[in-house]
């Protein structure tokens, strides 16, 4: 069972997160940020990950700390669940349509985390959610997971759809990348012999 569990408490947030890579797409999410709950539920569903999350944050200030810290914890859970990374396909990508939006996501479980976005989100808010926090979330996730993540918005002008497409697309790309190729189950997919 490839599982990562993270408990992280700071002066700004108290987070408990459990991730199962080989799940069924069940999300049990309470981040304290309604829009992020919706996005993470979609991420779990499209990645076929089981994700349980509880976060108590200083949302009276704003949602920034909760969103970024959840990205940190999800990244750490991915890194933990992947272990030595033996047998994984390593790479995953998708070009995902959502109505007028077209989103490309590509992931490399390289051990060298980095986030490389090309997103043009027209609105500063979707409901009460600051749209710039989407990039903050993915940057924290990529850094902590050791995953190189590219997101390219190929079309779209609806801010909700653009953000939603990022979470769905990353879920699909990561599902491919974490899949075990059983013919090479004892090999790390790198000529270096390690992905760290």
Q: What does each model-found stretch correspond to?
A:
Residues 1-196:
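Structural preference for solvent-exposed beta-strand-turn elements
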């Amino acid at each position: 069972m490839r599982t990562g569990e993270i408990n992280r408490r700071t002066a700004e947030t108290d987070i408990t997160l459990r991730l199962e890579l080989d799940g069924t797409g069940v999300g049990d999410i309470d981040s304290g940020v309604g829009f992020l709950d919706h996005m993470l539920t979609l991420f779990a569903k499209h990645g076929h990950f089981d994700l349980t999350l509880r976060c108590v944050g200083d949302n009276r200030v704003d949602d920034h700390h909760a969103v970024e810290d959840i990205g940190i914890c999800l990244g750490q859970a991915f890194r933990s669940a992947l272990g030595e990374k033996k047998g994984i396909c390593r790479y995953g990508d998708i070009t995902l349509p959502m109505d007028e939006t077209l989103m490309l996501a590509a992931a490399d479980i390289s051990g060298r985390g980095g986030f490389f976005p090309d997103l043009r989100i027209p609105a500063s808010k979707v409901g009460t959610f600051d749209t710039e926090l989407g990039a903050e979330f993915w940057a924290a996730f990529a850094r902590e997971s050791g995953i190189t993540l590219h997101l390219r918005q190929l079309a779209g002008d609806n801010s909700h759809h653009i953000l939603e497409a990022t979470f769905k697309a990353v879920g699909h790309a990561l599902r491919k990348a974490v899949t075990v190729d059983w013919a090479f189950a004892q090999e790390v997919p790198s000529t270096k012999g390690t992905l760290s």
